[in-house]
Design a protein with these regions (language model features):
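Sequence-specific dsDNA recognition surfaces
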Residues: 7-48, 64-66, 71-74, 183-203, ...
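Short, ligand-facing micro-motifs at secondary-structure edges
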Residues: 17-21, 38-54, 58-71, 89-91, ...
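Short hydrophobic-aromatic micro-motifs
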Residues: 30-33, 39, 51-54, 78, ...
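A short glycine-rich beta-alpha junction/loop motif
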Residues: 70-77, 109-129, 208, 269-277, ...
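Ligand-binding loop in jelly-roll beta-barrel domains
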Residues: 83-88, 266, 281-287
Length: 371
């Protein structure tokens, strides 16, 4: 096995194609950008399978293995194997992906990376048959991960179908479930509350342990990822009005506005971040899991949330107005039946997550050993 550098085994090539120039181009050849396929055009720049790296802007350092007879736009860069060095393109792709090229970024406004910097990355080059064998192993692991993710998506679709089956289309004018203001399904108006302002909590008060501070990334992951920041117990007690306890619904009020998750029953109470909004429903009127899915699936509720969100640069929910949005109140027994169904589906999703995590750890271990 040879230990070389990326620059020893491949060369760069540039694209001068701007996405704005593709509007009138129609054909059979794919052209790609940082987010994937843009469209089919009537030309191509590469006639062999190749690697593309995002070199400018969002997604910088992301690596793609792309087909022959295709192209990329100017924010990406081609990596092409050099002649005379036997190398499997898939092996090269997995090796480059493992390098985490984003660490070479520079530029504050528009980040970018340069081949002259990352070409120094070391790469193991075994014989060609070993390269192909390693590539096949990674292909199989990736296929298993993709399959599990697809199963997880199907489980989400099953929950949505069950919601509609049990409660109908809540946006339909013919829907006859009683309605109530959101604040009226809470025991107290202050049960709907956004996190503490910067004057009440600043970053200097963050700790590495203590009481968890729950932020938007954790909500987006349905609380399946660990908190990044903590508060000491005295500070948490001072901010008790902004607590989150099992059964509370946490909602992002900035960025991905309206994304929400129910705080798990086996978690210790924490504090919500200023970008997070807490909804603590009265369990005698509304089941939290049903309420969360109503926030996700009801077209009527989603439109109301859009109306109470404002901001020219970044939307943010107006909490006072949110308290007055109208929600549906099906019989509590029906809500509980739906919540029980979701609990069973969540167990299946958890098993899929564990499998995905296992395969990802396996892949990482193999990359560290072989690449």
């Amino acid at each position: 096995m040879k230990r070389l550098t990326l620059g020893d085994v491949c060369k760069k090539a540039s694209s001068n194609i701007a996405q704005k120039d593709l509007q009138d181009k129609i054909g059979a050849y794919p052209i790609y950008g940082a987010s994937g396929l843009i469209k089919q055009v009537d030309f191509y720049q590469q006639d062999k399978e190749y690697i593309a790296v995002v070199k400018d802007g969002a997604g910088i350092g992301r690596t793609m293995l792309l087909p022959a007879y295709s192209s990329v736009i100017g924010t990406m860069q081609y990596l092409l194997p050099k002649e005379g060095i036997p190398i499997d393109i898939k092996y090269l792709f997995y090796a480059v992906e493992h390098m985490n090229l984003a660490k070479y970024f520079s530029g504050a406004t528009i980040p970018h990376i340069y081949f002259k910097d990352y070409q120094k990355e070391p790469i193991n080059i075994p014989d060609i048959e070993t390269q192909r064998r390693i590539s096949r192993i990674f292909d199989k692991i990736d296929a298993l991960i993709t399959s599990r993710k697809e199963q997880r998506t199907k489980l989400d679709q099953i929950v949505k179908s069950r919601f509609i089956e049990m409660f109908g289309d809540l946006a339909d004018p013919a829907c006859d479930w009683p309605q109530s203001k959101l604040t009226e399904v809470c025991a107290d108006p202050d049960d709907i509350k956004c996190g503490p302002f910067g004057t009440q909590l600043n970053k200097a008060e963050y700790r590495h342990e203590g009481v968890a501070l729950w932020e938007i990334p954790q909500i987006n992951a349905q609380f399946r990822v660990e908190p990044t920041h903590y508060l000491d117990f005295d500070k948490a007690a001072e901010l008790d009005a902004y607590s989150i306890i099992p059964g509370d619904i946490a909602m992002s009020r900035k960025g991905n506005v309206g994304q929400c998750a129910v705080f798990p029953c086996d978690y210790m109470p924490g504090i919500i971040h200023s970008d997070v909004l807490r909804i603590r429903v009265d369990s005698g009127k509304m089941v939290p899991i049903f309420m969360m899915y109503q926030l996700h699936y009801s077209g009527t509720v989603k439109r109301q949330i859009e109306q109470v969100s404002s901001g020219a640069i970044m939307a943010g929910i107006n909490v006072t107005k949110l308290k007055s949005i109208m929600v549906h109140l099906p019989p509590l027994e029906l809500q509980e039946q739906f919540a029980d169904f979701v609990t069973q589906i969540d167990k299946s999703k958890y098993r899929q997550e564990k499998c995905i995590g296992f395969f990802q750890c396996l892949e990482k271990s193999i990359r560290q050993e072989w690449l």
